[in-house]
Amino acid sequence: MGARASVLSGGKLDAWEKIRLRPGGKKKYRLKHIVWASRELKRFALNPGLLETTEGCKKIIGQLQPSLQTGSEELKSLFNTIVVLYYVHQKIEVRDTKEALDKLQEEQDKHQQKTQQATADKGVSKGVSQNYPILQNLQGQMVHQSLSPRTLNAWVKVIEEKAFSPEVIPMFSALSEGATPQDLNTMLNTVGGHQAAMQMLKDTINEEAAEWDRLHPVHAGPIPPGQMREPRGSDIAGTTSTLQEQIAWMTSNPPVPVGEIYKRWIILGLNKIVRMYSPVSILDIKQGPKEPFRDYVDRFFKTLRAEQATQEVKGWMTETLLVQNANPDCKTILKALGPGATLEEMMTACQGVGGPSHKARILAEAMSKATGAAIMMQKSNFKGQRRIVKCFNCGKEGHIARNCRAPRKRGCWKCGQEGHQMKDCTERQANFLGKMWPSNKGRPGNFLQNRPEPTAPPAESFGFGEEIAPSPKQEQKDKEQVPPLISLKSLFGSDQ
């Protein structure tokens, strides 16, 4: 124990015993931890004498660190102890185990960055090309690395899922970064379907190749020794050139980027195909009455990507058509924002338009307006139709019998006879069965008594002693006109 305890002495031992096992904990490192570490090193077949120096601790750390992921808790504790002891030997102050581990990680990261930088500087000094897929090996030879099956699979999957929608073009551009004409032809040949579109693409490539030949005529005379021939349009398309020639053109000084030129031709043809597969014009993109504004904006910009126009024209379309083709609800909101509103402000302002909450709010406003108009109409109608009441007792208007000041009439208010009230009166008005109202008692009670009744006495009261006898024809006519009491003739006329 004494031999192992002599690893630290003097000021190093005092610094060791001030370091805590855990951040904020009470327990600190002691000599027993060094003794335990030396025994564990023997168990792992390592030399315990390495604990006495900084370089020895560094070697132990290098041996134990790769095994931390699969090691036991004892191995991790041993590693932590060695790291703390490593910084005590360097006289670097640490407060606890975690701080020592953080310092070690930071030190290793800096060392790794320096190593990578040195490797990169060495590669640049030797002129090694890092331009994928054309790489320069250590012998200085240009080597082509073909496209991986994963890249080709991603391209085929995009074509199968998206057909030739506008997002296919940036996907093709990303997957074909730095590719040679041979790589580009490999990508095009992997497309199984859509042969009509591929034929359109071939026609576009042939047109661009012919234009290249017209603008870059072949120089007369033989080619000087050691100089490459100039690429023709068919060479750029990869039909009359080999892979070695393509690499030589792309890496010569000055280089001829045949891969980038061919890529531009393909993208030009893809733009034509996208326009054919997206026949909808930007002028036809209009927001539906119930369509959320966000979905409308998505459709608008998806169609705008397929439009073959300059950025200035697309900006004008966005500022003008996006507001003009919105539905009335959103258009009102967008016009209130003004012409300088950003897309974020538009989408925030129109958020919820067309949704359930917006519909409920509009419906509530419409119902409140309709209800208010109906109430005002009813109030105005009631003002013009004031009910006129009539007293049953005195027959005057303006009050009812309960408030009448005239002497109370005796008997029934309906027939005038005493002995019963109006509710028990047997004299009924004409019903739907045709029961007639006595002609000598005026009009029935359900008619207004506005017709003046004759006040002259009957003819027999003059005392002439003569009776006015009706003629036989008049009597027969009266019998025919008066229907029986239980007849429906009074209701339906001569149909019965």
UniProtKB/Swiss-Prot annotation:
Gene Ontology CC: one annotated term: host multivesicular body
Family (UniProt): Belongs to the primate lentivirus group gag polyprotein family.
Site for Cleavage, residues: Y132, P133, L363, A364, M376, M377, N431, F432, F447, L448
Intervals of motif Nuclear localization signal: 26-32
Originating organism: Human immunodeficiency virus type 1 group M subtype F2 (isolate MP257) (HIV-1)
Record region (Interaction with host CALM1): 8-43
Segments carrying motif PTAP/PSAP motif: 454-457
Biased composition (Basic and acidic residues): 103-112
InterPro entries reported in the protein's UniProt record: Gag_p24_C, Gag_p6, Lentvrl_matrix_N, Matrix_HIV/RSV_N, Primate_lentivir_Gag_pol-like, Retrov_capsid_C, Retrov_capsid_N, Retrovr_matrix
Alphabetized UniProt keyword annotations: AIDS, Capsid protein, Host cell membrane, Host cytoplasm, Host endosome, Host membrane, Host nucleus, Host-virus interaction, Lipoprotein, Membrane, Metal-binding, Methylation, Myristate, Phosphoprotein, Repeat, RNA-binding, Viral budding, Viral budding via the host ESCRT complexes, Viral nucleoprotein, Viral release from host cell, Virion, Zinc, Zinc-finger
The protein, known as: Gag polyprotein
Modification after translation: Gag-Pol polyprotein: Specific enzymatic cleavages by the viral protease yield mature proteins. Capsid protein p24 is phosphorylated possibly by host MAPK1; this phosphorylation is necessary for Pin1-mediated virion uncoating.
Region of interest (Interaction with Gp41), residue spans: 7-31
Zinc finger region(s), CCHC-type: 389-406, 410-427
Name of encoding gene: gag
Keyword Membrane among UniProt keywords: yes
